[in-house]
Each structure stands twice: as structure tokens, then as C-alpha cells.
Amino acid sequence: MVKEKTNKVERLPITNDYIFKRVFAFEGNESVLKDFLEAILKKDIEEVEIKNPEIIPYEKDEKRGLLDIKAQIDDGTILDIEMQMEDEKNTEERGTEYLGKMISEQLQEGEEYIKLKKSIVIFITNYNFLKRNSYHSVGKVKFDETLPEEYVNMGYKEEDEIASKYIEFHYIELPKY
């Protein structure tokens, strides 16, 4: 009896860390990342450049950062795209840390603040993180209602006024899709 040898190919999902980076951050696949970012950010993008994902600490005892995918688009916006399979109960903290480091590494001593570029963190999670029903949520820094009501009624506060146009979070929760 002759035994037939079969080659089984294991199919890995796009949520696998290796596959995710291979598809979106591999040299030559910039168009795939561009299309993905256009869909998420709802804007036309001319060019996307994949950057070194390592965030090098300034101090020896500072936490090192290694982003899944770091990219920059043609308007200068810097992006971190993270695939999170397990809820380690630190999504908000991790995103804030990564965003802060992406901002702090932009300017060198003596550079003008006007050179600061928008930074966006995109989390794709395999778990529910937010209480909202939407699978895609966008977080921006907005002003709270702090003015006395009479000033608000006189037009001194614009509804949903953005406190900083340089900071943005996107959460894509796969179980809600």
C-alpha cells in the first residue's frame, strides 16, 4: 500500500500578527495600506510611507515602544495601526502612551511648534472595548461644557469644538462588525 503525501496549508487570518504586518506593512504593499486608511479615515490619500515602528526611548529607564505598523500619509499625518487580539485591559492606556510618544518624537529642540503633525492611533480589536454599538468609533479631544450657561447661549462656545486637531483615536471592534 502506497501512502499519499498531502501538503496541508494552514490558513492564517488577517488578525494574525505576522499576516497583518505582511499584508499592510510589507514593502511593495503600500497601496493596500493606502486603501485601508482611506476607508478608515474617509479621505483621499495620495501617498503612504511605512516607517520604522520602533519608538526609541530618550532615557535608559523609559519604556520602549514597538508599534505594529507606523506610517505617514501625504498630508504629514503620522499613524499607528495596532491589531489587538486579546483584551489585556490596557487598550486606552496603551493607545495614549503610543500617541504621546509619536507626538513627542516629532520636534527637535528649537523647532517651531507649527511643524507638529497630526497623530492618529487606530486600534483593531478582536474584543469589545467601548460600550457603544458602532464597530468603528472615532475619539477626538473636545472641550467640556465649562462656561456659564449665559456665555454659551451668547455664542461663545461652538458645539463639538475640537481642543486639538493633532490627536485622534480610531477603534475598530471586530465582534461588532
Where are these regions (language model features)?
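Elongated, amphipathic alpha-helical interaction scaffolds
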Residues: M1-Y177
